[in-house]
Amino acid sequence: MKNTILILFTAFIALLGFFGMSAEALADPKADPLAGPNPDADPEAINLKAIAALAKKLLG
């Protein structure tokens, strides 16, 4: 019984991951999958360079 639940749970998580990645690909079809987030496609994307600059400024 535990094995069946584990297999079903794993399959469910795999499907969520697959459809989640498909939704990202549809939202920005010309994006490079190895590149970071495209700020033009996602206006709420995290700006890592700005965060790094702020941390460097705060920490000296």
Swiss-Prot record:
Gene Ontology molecular function, alphabetical: toxin activity
A single BP term in Gene Ontology: innate immune response
GO CC entries: extracellular region; membrane; other organism cell membrane
Signal peptide: 1-27
Highest taxon listed in the record's lineage: Eukaryota
Localization: Secreted; Target cell membrane
Tissue expression profile of the protein: Expressed by the venom gland.
Modified residues (Leucine amide): L59
UniProt keyword Transferase, yes or no: no
Residues excised as propeptide: 28-45
AXPX repeat positions: 27-30, 31-34, 35-38, 41-44
Keywords: Amidation, Antibiotic, Antimicrobial, G-protein coupled receptor impairing toxin, Immunity, Innate immunity, Mast cell degranulation, Membrane, Repeat, Secreted, Signal, Target cell membrane, Target membrane, Toxin
Misc remark: The primary structure of this mature peptide is identical to that of Mastoparan-VT1 from Vespa tropica (AC P0DQZ4), and mastoparan-like peptide 12c from Vespa magnifica (AC A0SPI0).
Similarity annotation: Belongs to the MCD family. Mastoparan subfamily.
Function: Antimicrobial and mast cell degranulating peptide. Has broad spectrum antibacterial activity against both Gram-positive (S.aureus MIC=32-64 ug/ml, S.xylosus MIC=2 ug/ml, and S.alactolyticus MIC=16 ug/ml) and Gram-negative bacteria (C.koseri MIC=4 ug/ml, E.coli MIC=8 ug/ml, K.pneumoniae MIC=48 ug/ml, P.aerugiosa MIC=128 ug/ml, S.choleraesuis MIC=32 ug/ml, S.typhimurium MIC=32 ug/ml, and V.parahamelytics MIC=64 ug/ml). Affects membrane permeability of E.coli. Shows hemolytic activities on sheep, chicken and human erythrocytes.
Name of the protein in question: Mastoparan-M
